[in-house]
Structure formats: structure tokens, C-alpha cells
């Protein structure tokens, strides 16, 4: 079983490498743009949520 598993992963990695390679330049740009937009939105939302939360806790404690 262990031997089979190892060979399977090898293979798999080989297939992945070929594919990456090939569409790395094409999706590179698209991936970067999507990531940047998502990150900025998430950061803003997270900050507001945590703030809030923090201020609420402080009020309750006092």
C-alpha cells in the first residue's frame, strides 16, 4: 500500500508540473488581480469587525 501511494503522488506531481507550467503565465496575471482585490476587501472587513468587537467588550467590562 505504501509503495502504491508513493507512486501515485509522484505521478500526480508530474502531471501538475506540466499543467502549471503551461498556464502559469496566462493565469498569473488574473490570479494576482483577484488576490489583490479579495485581500483588500477582507482586511477592511476584518478590521471593522475586530474593532467593534473590542470596543463592545471594553464597554461591558467597565
Swiss-Prot record:
Function in brief: Protamines substitute for histones in the chromatin of sperm during the haploid phase of spermatogenesis. They compact sperm DNA into a highly condensed, stable and inactive complex.
Family: Belongs to the protamine P1 family.
Reported tissue expression: Testis.
Main location: nucleus
Protein name stated in the entry: Sperm protamine P1
Cellular compartment(s): Nucleus; Chromosome
GO biological process, one term: cell differentiation
GO molecular function: DNA binding
Top-level taxon of origin: Eukaryota
UniProt GO cellular component terms: nucleosome; nucleus
Keywords assigned by UniProt, alphabetized: Chromosome, Developmental protein, Differentiation, DNA condensation, DNA-binding, Nucleosome core, Nucleus, Spermatogenesis
Region called Disordered, residue ranges: 1-62
Amino acid at each position: 500500500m505504501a509503495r502504491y501511494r508513493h507512486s501515485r503522488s509522484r505521478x500526480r506531481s508530474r502531471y501538475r508540473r506540466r499543467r502549471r507550467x503551461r498556464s502559469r503565465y496566462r493565469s498569473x496575471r488574473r490570479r494576482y488581480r483577484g488576490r489583490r482585490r479579495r485581500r483588500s476587501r477582507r482586511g477592511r472587513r476584518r478590521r471593522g469587525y475586530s474593532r467593534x468587537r473590542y470596543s463592545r467588550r471594553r464597554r461591558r467590562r467597565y
